[in-house]
Swiss-Prot record:
Any Gene Ontology CC annotation: cytoplasm
PANTHER family referenced in this protein's UniProt entry, alphabetically: 60 KDA HEAT SHOCK PROTEIN, MITOCHONDRIAL
UniProt cross-references to NCBIfam families, sorted A to Z: GroEL, PRK00013.1, PRK12849.1, PRK12850.1, PRK12851.1
Name recorded for this polypeptide: Chaperonin GroEL
Taxonomic placement: Bacteria, Pseudomonadati, Pseudomonadota, Gammaproteobacteria, Pseudomonadales
Gene that this sequence comes from: groEL
Amino acid sequence: MAAKEVKFGDAGRKKMLAGVNVLADAVKATLGPKGRNVIIEKSFGAPLITKDGVSVAKEIELKDRFENMGAQLVKDVASRANDDAGDGTTTATVLAQAIVNEGLKAVAAGMNPMDLKRGIDKATIAIVAELKKLSKPCTDTKAIAQVGTISANSDHSIGDIIAEAMEKVTKDGVITVEEGSGLENELSVVEGMQFDRGYLSPYFINKPDTMVAELDSPLLLLVDKKISNIREMLPVLEAVAKAGRPLLIVAEDVEGEALATLVVNNMRGIVKVAAVKAPGFGDRRKAMLQDIAVLTGGTVISEEIGLSLETTTLEHLGNAKRVILNKENTTIIDGAGVKTDIDSRISQIRQQIGDTSSDYDKEKLQERLAKLSGGVAVIKVGAGSEVEMKEKKARVEDALHATRAAVEEGVVPGGGVALVRSLQAIEGLKGDNADQDVGIALLRRAVEAPLRQIVANSGDEPSVVVDKVKQGSGNFGYNAASGEYGDMIEMGILDPAKVTRSALQAASSIASLMITTEAMIADVADEKAAGGGMPDMGGMGGMGGMM
């Protein structure tokens, strides 16, 4: 086992604080509408230019192991805020730096670290409760666009396109961000339910110019097994032919004789038909087949519930206005499902999202929810170069997370004002002893840090602005982009309450742990590896007599 170096008390805390400050100083330069850029070297290709706090934090590794521990802990603050709300990483980093600096000063002055932590925790709980009171619902498109704009560093085009996407697919819809091919941002929306399985045979294509199979007013046969024997299907095919409607078959697979017969019938015009594999695998496939059944008002033909293909009738089939199949995807438009059944299925999936702890499962459930409730929107980010594309895409993703958070928990005045206004919640707050009171007081100073940093980045004097904002009330604050004071909500400067709350909770949680640190342990630096020299070979002098 490698030897370890241990640092105790102030010696360790000083090193840790140095690491905290290096990372936080690099990240906080990006905060606010006049935040500066950070350039990051890449091992290949052009350097990355970014104003995204979490991208900066991820790149920082320090040579000194003890300083690096401090930097990594603050990086964890940014990651926690990002995981919880998807944005607010820079605010969380600025808050953590302020709390750690103030806290370690108090520890050096002889305060009890555990009581300081309890004071910080009390004040955090009170401020979070006040932020919830300050928050206002965010439902209209204009407010959503404003939140997106602020999060994307005052880029109106990003805020507007996110608001438009949310309006089209509702708050439950899936919005994905991709790299575009032009200079302008583009939005495309997929109507209805789309899943990533295409036609099983190109002979189903009936629109050769666009290479798609399009079925108008089709019936849908949903089968939870492989179909290889055409005889099983004859009764249902005859019934569909009599009804004179097209048929879409969604099954685990359609192969051999069954597929060949369907193709021949389709080409001869006896039954207009197309077949596609069911999406997903295993239990997820069964769930997605059931989703399609609910959406189209059909029944999944499954032996588990005592249904077989031979006994299938038209009553078991789903209905839709139109189905479009291409090589990769199938889209079902305007399914004829009963609204109450669809709503019930949606609430069931929401419940599963709340119960699962797996990020992968959560993502897949969110996709299913979107397909049932709203649809899927794709934002294609346009830019003039690859470097700009990466930077812009990161900002669009941040803005998207921020707008989702705003819809979820409402909005508060932006620009660091909400945290300053929430100070009234801890005006009369008292701890159990003097050291806890110091913990409460240091958080009171620390929550001003984001406003101070925004002002500093815009080239103004932080103390003057903070005093003037404190003298005001309600939504009164400072617009760093224009240098004006006024109502932040009216000026369109909004922050999602969830982002501000998550940033404060993540910062005070990690900072409290750092304040209560008494010992730090790290591997001893390997001097030989650093020198890279060859070992001493002096003992080989007696080899001269060898032949």
